[in-house]
Swiss-Prot record:
Pathway linked to the protein: Amino-acid biosynthesis; L-arginine biosynthesis; L-arginine from L-ornithine and carbamoyl phosphate: step 1/3
Chief location of this protein within or outside the cell: cytoplasm
Catalytic activity: carbamoyl phosphate + L-ornithine = L-citrulline + phosphate + H(+)
Name by which UniProt lists this protein: Ornithine carbamoyltransferase
Keywords: Amino-acid biosynthesis, Arginine biosynthesis, Cytoplasm, Transferase
Coiled-coil portions: none
Function description: Reversibly catalyzes the transfer of the carbamoyl group from carbamoyl phosphate (CP) to the N(epsilon) atom of ornithine (ORN) to produce L-citrulline.
Subcellular location per the Swiss-Prot or TrEMBL entry: Cytoplasm
Residues that bind L-ornithine: N169, D233, S237, M238
Domain of life: Bacteria
Pfam family membership, one: OTCace
Length: 334
């Protein structure tokens, strides 16, 4: 079934129906196959795209740029120091200026209200590259990756667990995505790190319509048993104070994904996922500081899991580009 998403914003998965999300995933798979097969047809030729990054990025920026280039579009990158947004010019005014010059706008930054305002006033499609509350393009990549590794299961037949800080944009977005697609998600975290009650209630209401199951638990063994996928993210998110580390590490250490947790799934085919970057060894400046301060070689995931046959994080990272391409083509393409 064809769907017309032209001129739609892509700000959060709550705005989309399960069938629309499934359409974007199907289009992602088609575009990925076309790129690999060498017969990709540009559908964004002549389009100009603005990429607003108020937070730094590797995967999201590269994914948007390569996806745009593949499809014939040109991009302008506006980094944290490259615009007047919020300093000398309001987002409302910026939206109306950029909307006159560009055919589509990506935003990666802080509050969800900011990207919502951009979407309200730009007059062209606006895509959320990450906010404090939601990370919808990451979820499309995650679900495409799950489909590729699910051994024939539909999304609605998949059970997965998210361990760690479940109140951040990834916990929120995975819960919304699972609710929309009829999946079973288990948020395994200290209670104070569960998503906001209002969002949980909203997702539970969606789950009643889709057959999804949302479980919140503090028990790791209970949470991971029988899972098809285990997912985690960093324990301290972008923008949080360094002083938060001590308390956070103490609270989160029981939720580290290590080989014992892998075994606790009782599923030899379980796969490990992470939106990246990950603290899994001491080969980075921050990783080395963590190892020295806490005596841990890896935080949210251990090196042996990250580099194991269970890990599909780099397929997941690649799929950022294919799914972002699908969003741009669906909302802007000819």
């Amino acid at each position: 079934m064809a769907f017309n998403l032209r001129n739609r914003n892509f700000l959060k998965l709550l705005d989309f129906t399960p069938k629309e999300i499934a359409h974007l995933l199907e289009l992602s798979a088609e575009l990925k196959k076309a790129k690999y097969s060498g017969y990709e047809q540009p559908r964004l030729t002549g389009k100009n795209i603005a990429l607003i990054f108020e937070k730094s990025s590797t995967r999201t920026r590269c994914a948007f740029e390569v996806a745009a280039f593949d499809q014939g579009a040109k991009v302008t990158y506006l980094g944290p120091s490259g615009s007047q947004i919020g300093h000398k010019e309001s987002m409302k005014d910026t939206a109306r200026v950029l909307g006159r010059m560009y055919d589509g706008i990506e935003y990666r930054g802080f509050g969800q209200t900011i990207v919502e305002e951009l979407g309200q006033y730009a007059g062209v499609p606006v895509w959320n590259g990450l906010t404090d509350e939601f990370h919808p393009t990451q979820i499309l990549a995650d679900f495409l990756t799950m489909q590729e590794y699910a051994n024939g299961k539909q999304l609605s037949q998949i059970t997965f667990a998210y361990l760690g800080d479940a109140r951040n944009n990834m916990g929120n977005s995975l819960m919304v995505g699972a609710a929309k697609m009829g999946m079973e998600i288990r948020l395994v975290a200290p209670k104070q790190f569960w998503p906001e009650e209002e969002l949980v209630t909203q997702c539970q209401e969606i789950a009643l319509q889709t057959g999804a199951k949302i479980v919140l638990t503090e028990e790791v063994t209970e949470g991971v048993k029988g899972c098809d996928f285990l997912y985690t993210d960093v324990w301290v998110s972008m923008g949080e104070a360094p002083e938060a580390w001590d308390e956070r590490v103490a609270l989160m250490t029981p939720y580290q994904i290590n080989m014992d947790v892998i075994k606790a799934t009782e599923n030899p085919n379980v796969k490990f996922m992470h939106c990246l970057p990950a603290f899994h060894n001491d080969e980075t400046t921050l990783g080395k500081e963590i190892a020295e301060k806490y005596g841990m070689n890896g935080l949210e995931v251990t090196e042996d899991v990250f580099e194991s046959e269970y890990s599909i994080v780099f397929d997941e990272a690649e799929n950022r580009m294919h799914t972002i391409k699908a969003v741009m083509v669906a909302t802007l393409g000819s």
